[in-house]
């Protein structure tokens, strides 16, 4: 017995036990020693339980040694020496921007998911039709979002230099130009809608094509409202006000669910409009959001961006327009190439059957939810970089972008790996079709596998755009899109017969 106590004393004299964090382990050791003292001295050496206890005790010692080694490695990193400054950066600059953007994007995507639920109850043909039409709508929304990005950067730079007038003029002119462009675009798409759907849908069934055309013709009417909402929200974010866009877009999407639900399925004795109600509800909701954005800007809720309604009829200042477009056009080319490549891959998928089309659509919806924190951090990096460079703090902009990048990479990888085992459960919220669910599960696991490289292709380019360097990201996007997403996706998915998995492998190569 004395020999065992002395052995325990020698172990406890190890310097590792001097760390305050080891107090819980020391209490465990004391409990073991008390149990040893209470045992029969003669039978102690022959008791199997005593050897089992010492085996666990040695395991505890090994774990503590590993913990000590890890602690020394962490203490030797550059991150540990600057952890206080990173903590201040996270809570004072990243969080106030990223959290409202995250909540806003979450509202948008969750409402999109709920909209998908509403349509999915009409059948998988209806869901496939919405997916095909939305794959084209996303190209247009990507273009509007890119001009919105240019407005955000110019507003952030202008306010960083204390030039409120330039920020207001940039916002006003972006709203005017993009509204007029959206009206023209909606007219053209409405006229050529049938040809567009034939091009996008490929070998889809006639019923799916008819539903996709109906949805497209209804949603193009909302393009002017979508442009106003996106650009107005981007200007407010550039001014550092991320809560107002959150409230407006969150309310807008809740209204979309309520209005669409009533229009699709009816209310009381009214039977509703069926599938037509989905597109009509989205259009009405977007116009309500556009009116709310114009009202917020008119009353000067953010004093830096007070824009009266009559000011929209003033002459345009083309020097500011070209500054916005100098960022927005390369960014829009990148976004349009990205969504166009996605549209082409959708065409690859369109010939693989209705179940694969629906599963691909659902998997993209779930992946977008998983990627929400990274999208929010990417938007925050654009604003933070623009602000810092606006006041000439180049080194600080680099440090902050690097921090946001690693935060996004580690966070998204953890989320993707933790949610992948529940892919089947998430798919069940959308559909009960076993074939569709099988497709979704495979694609979500693939998404988790390649998540560690996502931030390098999303957050870093967002930071470059905040530095008014959108051209480099545009060229990289152009080469990778057509060289990888389209070519590799076609070779693997169509030529080699990998199906939708091959198409997604092309996306990961991109």
Positions of the model-derived regions?
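Short runs within selected transmembrane alpha-helices of multi-pass transporters and secretion channels
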Residues: 148, 218-237, 245-253, 278-294, ...
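Transmembrane helical elements of multi-pass membrane transporters/channels
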Residues: 96-115, 218, 285-289, 293, ...
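Generic alpha-helical transmembrane segments of integral inner-membrane proteins
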Residues: 102, 106, 110, 114, ...
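Short alpha-helical transmembrane segments in multi-pass integral membrane proteins
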Residues: 54-101, 155-222, 270-329, 385-450, ...
């Amino acid at each position: 017995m004395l020999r065992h106590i002395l052995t325990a004393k020698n172990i406890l004299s190890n310097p590792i036990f001097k760390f305050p964090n080891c107090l819980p382990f020391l209490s465990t050791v004391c409990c073991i020693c008390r149990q040893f003292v209470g045992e029969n001295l003669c039978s102690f050496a022959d008791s199997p339980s005593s050897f089992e206890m010492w085996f666990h005790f040695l395991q505890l010692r090994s774990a503590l040694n590993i913990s000590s080694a890890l602690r020394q490695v962490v203490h030797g990193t550059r991150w540990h020496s600057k952890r206080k400054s990173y903590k201040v950066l996270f809570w004072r600059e990243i969080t106030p921007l990223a959290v409202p953007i995250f909540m806003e994007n979450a509202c948008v995507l969750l409402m999109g998911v709920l909209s998908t639920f509403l349509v999915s109850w009409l059948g998988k043909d209806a869901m496939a039709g919405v997916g095909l039409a939305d794959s084209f709508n996303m190209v247009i929304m990507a273009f509007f979002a890119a001009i919105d990005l240019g407005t955000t950067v110019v507003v952030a730079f202008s306010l960083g230099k204390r030039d409120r007038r330039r920020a207001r003029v940039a916002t006003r002119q972006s709203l005017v130009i993009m509204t007029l462009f959206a009206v023209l675009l909606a007219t053209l798409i409405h006229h050529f809608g049938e040809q567009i759907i034939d091009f996008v849908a490929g070998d889809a069934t006639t019923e799916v094509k008819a539903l996709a055309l109906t949805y497209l013709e209804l949603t193009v009417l909302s393009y002017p409202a979508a442009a106003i909402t996106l650009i107005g929200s981007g200007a407010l974010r550039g001014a550092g006000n991320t809560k107002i866009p959150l409230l407006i877009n969150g309310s807008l999407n809740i209204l979309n669910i309520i209005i669409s639900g009533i229009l699709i399925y009816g209310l009381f004795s009214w039977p509703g409009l069926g599938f037509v109600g989905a597109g009509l509800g989205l259009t009405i909701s977007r116009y309500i959001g556009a009116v709310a954005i114009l009202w917020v800007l008119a009353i000067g809720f953010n004093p830096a961006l007070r824009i009266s309604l009559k000011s929209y009829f003033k002459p345009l200042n083309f020097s500011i327009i070209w500054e916005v477009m100098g960022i927005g056009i390369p960014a829009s080319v990148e976004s349009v190439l990205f969504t166009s490549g996605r549209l082409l891959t959708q065409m690859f998928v369109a010939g693989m059957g209705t179940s694969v089309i629906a599963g691909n659509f659902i998997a993209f919806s779930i992946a977008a939810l998983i990627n929400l924190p990274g999208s929010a951090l990417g938007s925050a990096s654009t604003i933070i970089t623009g602000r810092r460079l606006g006041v000439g703090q180049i080194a600080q902009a680099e440090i902050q972008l690097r921090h946001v990048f690693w935060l996004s990479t580690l966070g998204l990888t953890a989320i993707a790996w933790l949610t992948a085992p529940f892919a089947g459960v998430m798919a069940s919220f959308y559909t009960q079709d076993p074939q569709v669910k099988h497709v979704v599960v495979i694609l979500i696991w693939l998404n988790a596998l390649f998540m560690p490289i996502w931030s390098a292709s999303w957050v870093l380019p967002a930071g470059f755009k905040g530095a008014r360097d959108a051209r480099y990201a545009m060229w990289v996007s152009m080469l990778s899109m057509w060289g990888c997403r389209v070519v590799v996706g076609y070779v693997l998915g169509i030529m080699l017969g990998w199906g939708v998995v091959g198409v997604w492998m092309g996306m990961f190569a991109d």
